[in-house]
Regions:
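Catalytic phosphate/metal-binding cores of nucleic-acid and nucleotide-processing enzymes, i.e., regions
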Residues: 1-101
Length: 101
């Protein structure tokens, strides 16, 4: 298993443990839209989009553009590297424990 796949599994396991809904977007196919983040999540009513990258990975311009558009629309757009996993976990926990109005 590649380091990127192990990291993806770690993130998905954490989201499951937190009771979050998410879907893995399989891009790159003939009938799929390019630039969509890897994980589309709902965390306590908040839209969270996560683009996963390995330690040395780089986001493409279209991925960054999409994340920016999600951010502008009021969602949480995250470009996630392994060294930022703890910060990601804190954000998800904070969103998950936020009181709904």
């Amino acid at each position: 298993m590649t380091p990127e796949k192990r990291f993806e599994n770690k993130v998905k396991q954490f989201l499951k443990e937190q009771g979050c809904w998410f879907i893995k977007y399989w891009g790159g196919g003939r009938y799929t839209k390019s630039g969509i983040p890897d994980l589309l999540c709902c965390v306590n009513g908040h839209f969270v989009a996560v683009e996963l990258k390995s330690e040395n990975g780089e986001a493409k311009a279209l991925q960054l553009w999409t994340l920016d558009k999600i951010d502008q629309a009021g969602g949480y757009a995250i470009l996630l590297f392994p060294d930022k996993f703890d910060e990601f976990c804190k954000l998800i926990i904070d969103l998950n424990t936020e009181r709904k109005v």
